[in-house]
């Protein structure tokens, strides 16, 4: 029973780390990366559709993304969706392909992005700690039901704390890498 709780907690903490990593990937750096456009929704035949379902996003060079739209009739909708996103991008149309030059980030904008990334990291840490709290409370319920001993609870708390620290360290490493990436000119 305790082993199941521990395994579940580890899986949930791993998912928290992945979710934090994915959220940080959406924060724009000076480099072109297809995941920058993942959050964009396009009005395609009256329904909001993710951009990656109506177009192929690729990297042309370090500061340019290319978006190849599958259906030529949707080019205007894709262009409008990219322009109206809060990313500050201006696509240039070239047939069925949109070229999106990424403007260089100002120092002020970089610092704003670092604040956003730090907030994401803190959110990840809090989520990991919440998983730890939930796991420990489940084991304490088992102790009250006389299904495990107080020593088992203490041992479990120590083990959970160790892998909580390990997962928080992973989040901190991801944060440090993202901060370095953001400060590169």
From Swiss-Prot:
Q: Which CDD domains match?
A: RRF (cd00520)
Where, per UniProt, does this protein localize? Cytoplasm
Q: Can you name one GO molecular function term for this protein?
A: ribosomal large subunit binding
Write down the Gene3D superfamilies for this protein, in alphabetical order: 3.30.1360.40, Ribosome-recycling factor
For the biological process aspect of GO, one term held by this record is: cytoplasmic translational termination
- Pfam families hit by this protein: RRF
One Gene Ontology cellular component term attached to this UniProt record is: cytosol
Key words, A-Z: Cytoplasm, Protein biosynthesis
State the NCBIfam families in the record.
frr
Q: What does this protein do?
A: Responsible for the release of ribosomes from messenger RNA at the termination of protein biosynthesis. May increase the efficiency of translation by recycling ribosomes from one round of translation to another.
Family per record: Belongs to the RRF family.
User: Protein name, please?
Assistant: Ribosome-recycling factor
Q: State the taxonomy lineage.
A: Bacteria, Pseudomonadati, Pseudomonadota, Gammaproteobacteria, Alteromonadales
């Amino acid at each position: 029973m305790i082993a199941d709780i521990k395994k579940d907690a580890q899986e949930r903490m791993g998912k928290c780390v992945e979710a934090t990593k994915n959220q940080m990937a959406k924060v724009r750096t000076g480099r072109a990366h297809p995941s920058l456009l993942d959050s964009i929704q396009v009005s395609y035949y009256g329904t909001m559709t993710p951009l990656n379902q109506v177009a192929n996003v690729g990297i042309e060079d370090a500061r340019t993304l290319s978006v190849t739209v599958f259906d030529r009739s949707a080019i205007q909708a894709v262009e409008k969706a990219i322009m109206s996103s809060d990313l500050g991008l201006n696509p240039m149309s070239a047939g069925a392909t949109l070229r999106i030059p990424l403007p260089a980030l100002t120092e002020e904008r970089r610092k704003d992005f670092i604040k956003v990334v730090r907030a994401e990291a803190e959110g990840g840490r809090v989520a990991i700690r919440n998983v730890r709290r939930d796991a420990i409370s489940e084991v304490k319920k088992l102790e009250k039901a006389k299904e495990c001993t107080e020593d088992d609870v203490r041992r479990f708390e120590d083990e959970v704390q160790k892998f909580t620290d390990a997962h928080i360290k992973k989040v901190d490493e991801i944060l440090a890498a993202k901060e370095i990436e953001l400060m590169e000119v």
